[in-house]
Amino acid sequence: MNKLSHPNSNEYAEFYAGYVQRATSKGDVLAALPNQIDKIQAALGNLSDEQALFRDAPNEWTIKEVMGHLNDVERVFSYRLLRVSRNDSTPIPGFEQNDYVREAGLAAHPIKDLIQEFEHLRRANILATQNITAEAA
């Protein structure tokens, strides 16, 4: 697996500083990616669909919605990874996560399918990182 360098603060919007700091403070981000598949499976794999509809508060996401959000983010970051790895200098747009979750109809999706989808997306992203050249990293 490649080892990507940590980004400089001028390489990302200030909004992302907290995320970058948390991720880079834990060491090699790429090494952590496969472990998260197992952690999600262990934490959520035995939930029923009814249990996965739990939400902490009326305006909070359900467990299924959190899982759907993780899947959306895997797709978004896959696209961003492709753009950055190809030295595409055009602006990368954001996305409105609450709109994505609201429009996804995640209550109808089995939690096991959402977990499996995450695993496939994450494994594809891990493979994508292995093909990034040192110059692009």
Where are these predicted regions, by residue range?
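Histidine-centered divalent metal-coordination motifs
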Residues: 69
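Aromatic-glycine hotspot motif
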Residues: 1-63, 75-137
